[in-house]
UniProtKB/Swiss-Prot annotation:
GO molecular function: imidazolonepropionase activity; iron ion binding; zinc ion binding
Protein's name in the database: Imidazolonepropionase
Single GO BP term: L-histidine catabolic process to glutamate and formate
Binding site for N-formimidoyl-L-glutamate: 163, 333, 335
Pfam families: Amidohydro_1 (PF01979)
Residues reported to bind Fe(3+): 91, 93, 257, 331
């Protein structure tokens, strides 16, 4: 807490906040072993915003006089609302064309994923539609989806490519993601998502990506992160590790779709290379959990994908108790998690993965911020951080409690109101 210099241009005062969840304690613990006290609750609080940043946060009765002057700040009366950091949605496949609803019905009728893929379905089905889609159409669909995330209180969204699987159209996907507006977005290059029909082996395709695509993505600054789907029968560990090392040489941050279907070494590679995150992690065991706990790798858990694919859930309780920092996300994609519902993610985390509500809130704020290497900017409400703020008209304990929850929300991104109405 404490003031920074307030310059002369108009700032914002959020006052009459009933309960403020700053998450300062969770941020100080880097998102590990979260307890309720780490939400750092303040009653009857206020927040001051200047130049898109938080410059003061604390009990309203302690608001410095220079911030209380009407001429200096625009007042927003929270009227007893609850205020917390905007959610960080750290794993999505937001840019794509078409849907895979017919495949969903086929899976429910007993057709295997492998059979669907053999018939030209799966990721390759989305690939065909995405390659054929115009940049403008991808932007329009992506903006609509992004706005839906914003309406739920999300202020940062990660967006992966990976549904084009060639140079021209992977760049098109990343360009579409860059054109989205309203909140902070983070691009990830996921060319290593599936094997396109133009290639016969995963190793040859990884070589193509490393030699022909990564340098172009780096030069055009279309993404700052590189992801790969390491799995038995898909991208092999050894070739994937070589590919990720090349990405690091080019200046990319790295992350891994790891140990989703089998224990295939993805999480261990993540630790060895210093990846930002290992995502999915359904199959990891005690040895992998211990290594993750001793590292800076964030475990990104995606329970709606597990729900849709009817698989087991990751061992979240064992991970958290061992000291692994975890994040939660939707894995929004047209095939295995066609949902943007944050409440469902959090509810599954509580019901199926035995996470406490404070752990879920921290995972969707501080944990997500670490997964994106944005922990110094977002995830908690502290002086100097971005004014990414969610205001709700309900008690904080109603968060991630009802799938159909419909609280009235107001959302600020970088100090600008981007959703909701305040009088």
């Amino acid at each position: 807490m404490g003031p920074m210099c307030l310059n002369r241009h108009m700032g914002i005062l959020l006052k009459n906040i009933s309960t403020l969840l700053t998450l300062q304690g969770a941020a100080a613990k880097q998102g590990r072993r979260i307890k309720e006290e780490d939400l750092s609750l303040l009653q009857q609080a206020a927040v001051v915003i200047e130049k898109n940043k938080i410059v003061w946060v604390g009990p309203q009765k302690k608001l410095p006089k220079e911030f209380a002057r009407k001429k200096a700040l625009r007042d927003y009366d929270m009227r007893g609302r609850t205020v917390l950091p905007g959610f960080v949605e750290c794993h999505t496949h937001l840019i794509f064309a078409g849907d895979r609803a017919a495949e969903f019905e086929m899976r429910n009728q007993g057709v295997s994923y492998q059979e669907i893929a053999a018939k030209g379905g799966g990721i390759l089905s989305t690939m065909k539609k995405t390659r054929a889609s115009s940049l403008n159409d991808l932007v329009k669909a992506g903006q609509r989806r992004l706005d839906h995330f914003v309406s739920q209180g999300v202020t940062t969204v990660e967006i992966k490519s990976g549904y084009a699987l060639n140079l021209k159209d992977e760049l098109k996907m990343l360009q579409a993601a860059q054109k989205l507006s309203g909140i902070r977005t983070v691009n990830t290059f996921l060319g290593a998502h599936a094997l396109p029909p133009e290639f016969k082996s995963y190793e040859d395709y990884l070589t193509f990506l490393a030699d022909e695509v990564l340098p172009v993505v780096a030069k055009k600054k279309l993404a700052r992160r590189v992801d790969v789907f390491i799995e038995k029968g898909f991208f092999p560990p050894e070739a994937s590790e070589k590919y990720l090392r090349r990405a690091q040489e080019l200046g990319f941050e790295i992350l891994i779709h790891a140990d989703q279907m089998s224990l295939s070494g993805g999480s261990e590679i993540a630790v060895r290379l210093g990846a930002l995150s290992g995502d999915h992690l359904l199959q990891i065991e005690d040895k992998e959990i211990r290594k993750l706990a001793q590292s800076e790798v964030t475990g990104v858990l995606l329970p709606t994908a597990d729900l849709y694919t009817k698989t087991k859930y990751p061992p979240a309780r064992a991970m958290i108790d061992a000291g692994v920092r975890v994040a939660l996300a939707t894995d929004f994609n047209p095939g295995t998690s066609p949902t943007q519902n944050l409440n469902l993610v959090g509810l599954l985390a509580r019901l199926e993965m035995k996470m406490s509500l404070p752990e879920v809130i921290a995972a969707y704020t501080v944990g997500g911020a670490h997964a994106l290497n944005l922990q110094n900017e977002v995830g908690s409400l502290e002086v100097g951080k971005s004014a990414d703020i969610l205001c709700i008209d309900q008690d904080w304990q109603t968060l991630f409690y009802s799938v159909g929850e419909a609280s009235e929300k107001v959302v600020f991104s970088r100090g600008k109101k981007v959703f909701g109405t305040l009088k």
